[in-house]
């Protein structure tokens, strides 16, 4: 059984990672603190221990990836959360992004469509540190209407169009951060739901995400 240790060396590498992310333009100190607090190497196979704090994506279970820390920080900063907000995350993956959000003091409702990943995260001891994360197995396009409305929605996969069912589950004044596009490169957008029901869209930088898929995978 794997033994999880967060050594002084790991903490030193994490500080360097935070500096790298900061130099790339992340300014939100709370987001930087969250990256600094979370042992990213816990979320990866032990084979990646030496490189876990490089600013790049790595493979995890079910042909999925743990996102580049800069991307996680970028989306978290754009989401602009405040403590106790309800956040819907589509695509739990490694649960690293969910942990960053949990460090920011929000209530995270995260959906994973890959059953093996969902079950792995349910057994991942480190995540017990965050009682403010609730894990769900399901189709991200459907969201979680039972728990709506949400203050924020974070999509961690590329969507060709705005998922309107998720917009309906947002509060008035709520924000969605979503990488949009059907090619290899997507544009990060932030969509705000206005009082009159209209959507205000802000366009940001380009990224590369795996596509957001319909349905569940047993």
Name these PLM-found stretches.
Residues 1-88, 96-100, 104, 117-120, ...:
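Class I SAM-dependent transferase core
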Residues 80-200:
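Conserved nucleotide-cofactor-binding alpha/beta core module
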């Amino acid at each position: 059984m794997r033994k999880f240790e967060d050594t002084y060396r790991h903490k030193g590498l994490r500080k360097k990672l935070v500096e790298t992310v900061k130099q790339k333009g992340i300014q939100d100190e709370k987001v930087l603190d969250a990256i600094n607090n979370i042992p990213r190497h816990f979320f990866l196979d032990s084979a990646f221990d030496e490189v876990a704090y490089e600013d790049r994506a790595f493979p995890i279970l079910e042909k999925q990836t743990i996102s580049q820390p800069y991307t996680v920080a970028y989306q978290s900063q754009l989401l602009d959360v405040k403590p106790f907000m309800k956040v819907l995350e589509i695509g739990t993956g490694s649960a690293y992004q969910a942990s960053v959000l949990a460090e920011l003091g929000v209530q995270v409702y995260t959906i994973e469509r890959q059953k093996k990943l969902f079950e792995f995260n349910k057994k991942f001891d480190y995540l017990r540190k965050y009682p403010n994360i609730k894990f769900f197995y399901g189709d991200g396009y459907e969201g979680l209407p039972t728990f709506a409305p949400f203050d924020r929605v974070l999509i961690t996969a590329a969507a060709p169009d705005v998922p309107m069912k998720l917009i309906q589950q947002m509060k008035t004044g709520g924000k969605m951060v979503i990488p949009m596009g059907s090619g290899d490169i997507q544009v990060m957008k932030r969509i705000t739901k206005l009082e009159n029901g209209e959507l205000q869209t802000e366009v940001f930088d380009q990224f590369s995400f795996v596509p957001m898929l319909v349905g569940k995978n047993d």
